[in-house]
Amino acid sequence: MKRLLSLAFAAIALTIVSCGGSKKLTKEQRNDLKDTYESFKRELPEAIVSMDGDKVKLVLAEAVLFKINSADINPDYIPSLVKMSKILNKYPKTNVLISGFTDITGTEEYNKTLSEKRANSAKAVLVDNHVSNSRIHAWGMGAKNPIADNDTEAGRKQNRRVEFVVMYDYKEDKK
């Protein structure tokens, strides 16, 4: 039952992401996303930032955000999340989708739970820095979609991460 609920939540989250990019953005909305992208690139040089259509993706890939079996964010990277919060607060009509990930150590169920905790840890930092809780959606992906080789310790460290996707909130503009 727990696995079914997790799968249902992941499906809903993916639907949110896919629906968000399917609507036509206004020129102002597109400019806001472009400004968000440029601000992330400028203020967070340690991050990999990309713009894909109507979404901005941010990954602190080189950062060791989490120790093994931990959802506690490495204190060295809290300032990066604080900077991110300040940028997000300039664009209050955007949503933030946070995906948590693990390396391959641990069972699938354990990794799913741990990755959810990691996503929620990142969410808590954003909320503590005045990003509205209602704008943030967090979920765990477990060991899916590794960005580095899980056969090495260095690769496993990189896979213990969170990824952020910023997209425009269309609900705010419906009249």
Predicted regions and their residues:
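Periplasmic peptidoglycan-binding/anchoring modules of Gram-negative envelope and division proteins
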Residues: T36-S50, L65-S99, V127-D128, F164, ...
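Residues at or immediately flanking beta-strands
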Residues: I48, K55-K57, N95-L97, R135-H137, ...
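N-terminal targeting leaders that direct proteins to extracytoplasmic destinations
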Residues: K2-K55, P79
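Soluble non-cytosolic domains of exported or imported proteins
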Residues: N31, A71-P79, T105-K117
